[in-house]
């Protein structure tokens, strides 16, 4: 057996934050910019060996993350500062490591997760924003956040989310368990906060698109429940834009003792 094969293997988890506006999604793809590709390149430079990461949730093009979690395996023994400060020094400015934690062999960023949490940020103002234009979705019609919140409560629990599932979704089942969904207003911002065991493709953005129709008084509150029962994607509203969506947290069993930093996004109170 070679010396290389005898080296111990370390499993490391990282918390990742990124502005997805300049990337073609999380997942590494040929000939396009991805968050995964940039992170793996930076980690490989620090580890001095090729690194492959596994993430909790593969976000789409333009979607952001403040609470993404990844893991990787390496034979490189490094101090925590190397996996945070060192990796950040090799990353572009719109991707950053937030924390590092050594994890046991049975940990997997995706399969060990018990829930994912997203926040969708709507800038509800007559005039469009400039500085935050890629970090929020602009909607100029006045939105009734309390009405949206009431309408959304029918989505709680285990349901068939076919009406809010992208046509190209590859999940084996449309059933998902929504643990909470809250709609609140913070000045000009309307925030849709949703947590579930997992999500079908475009689920959050499709729900938000329909909730905005309710909030603008273009549809009655009962419409969301009717859409859920219909199990027909063609009846729901258009998919909300990617810019306002953030993966803000991923839940894991307490035994892994992973850090839980403020969720953000940072321009909102947590």
From Swiss-Prot:
Pfam families recorded for this chain? PseudoU_synth_1
Signal sequence, start to end = none
Q: Which reaction does it catalyse?
A: uridine(38/39/40) in tRNA = pseudouridine(38/39/40) in tRNA
Instruction: Provide any one GO MF term from the record.
Output: tRNA pseudouridine(38-40) synthase activity
Residues reported in the UniProt entry to bind substrate? 118
Q: Which GO terms describe its biological process?
A: tRNA pseudouridine synthesis
**Where do the record's region annotations for Interaction with tRNA lie?**
168-172
Superkingdom assignment: Bacteria
Active-site residues? Answer: 60
Could you say which EC number(s) this protein's record lists?
Answer: 5.4.99.12
Q: Which InterPro entries match?
A: PsdUridine_synth_cat_dom_sf (IPR020103), PsdUridine_synth_TruA (IPR001406), PsdUridine_synth_TruA_a/b_dom (IPR020097), PsdUridine_synth_TruA_C (IPR020095), TruA/RsuA/RluB/E/F_N (IPR020094)
Q: What's this protein's function?
A: Formation of pseudouridine at positions 38, 39 and 40 in the anticodon stem and loop of transfer RNAs.
Family, according to the entry, reads as follows: Belongs to the tRNA pseudouridine synthase TruA family.
Q: How does it assemble?
A: Homodimer.
Protein's name in the database: tRNA pseudouridine synthase A
Organism lineage string? Bacteria, Pseudomonadati, Pseudomonadota, Gammaproteobacteria, Enterobacterales
> Which gene carries the instructions for this protein?
truA
């Amino acid at each position: 057996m070679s010396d290389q094969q005898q080296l111990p293997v370390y499993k490391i988890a990282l918390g990742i934050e990124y502005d997805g506006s300049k990337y073609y999604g999380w997942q590494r793809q040929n000939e396009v910019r991805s968050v995964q590709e940039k992170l793996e390149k930076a980690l490989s430079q620090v580890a001095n060996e090729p690194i492959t990461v596994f993430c909790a949730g593969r976000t789409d093009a333009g979607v952001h993350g403040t609470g993404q979690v990844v893991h990787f395996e390496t034979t490189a023994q490094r101090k925590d500062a190397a996996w945070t400060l060192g990796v950040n020094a090799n990353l572009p400015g719109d991707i950053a490591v937030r924390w590092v934690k050594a994890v046991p062999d049975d940990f997997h960023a995706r399969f060990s997760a018990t829930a994912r949490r997203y926040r969708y940020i709507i800038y509800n103002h007559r005039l469009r924003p400039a500085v935050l234009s890629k970090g929020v979705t602009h909607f100029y019609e006045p939105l009734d956040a309390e009405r949206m919140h009431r309408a959304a409560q029918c989505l709680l629990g285990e349901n068939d989310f076919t009406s809010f599932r992208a046509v190209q979704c590859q999940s084996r089942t449309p059933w998902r368990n929504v643990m909470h969904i809250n709609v609140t207003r913070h000045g000009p911002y309307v925030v849709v906060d949703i947590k579930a065991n997992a999500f079908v493709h475009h689920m959050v953005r499709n729900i938000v698109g329909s909730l905005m129709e309710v909030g603008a008084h273009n549809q009655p509150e009962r419409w969301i429940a009717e859409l859920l029962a219909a199990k027909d994607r063609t009846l729901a509203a258009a998919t909300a834009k990617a810019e306002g969506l953030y993966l803000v947290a991923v839940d894991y069993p307490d035994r892994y003792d992973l850090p839980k930093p403020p969720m953000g996004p940072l321009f909102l109170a947590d």
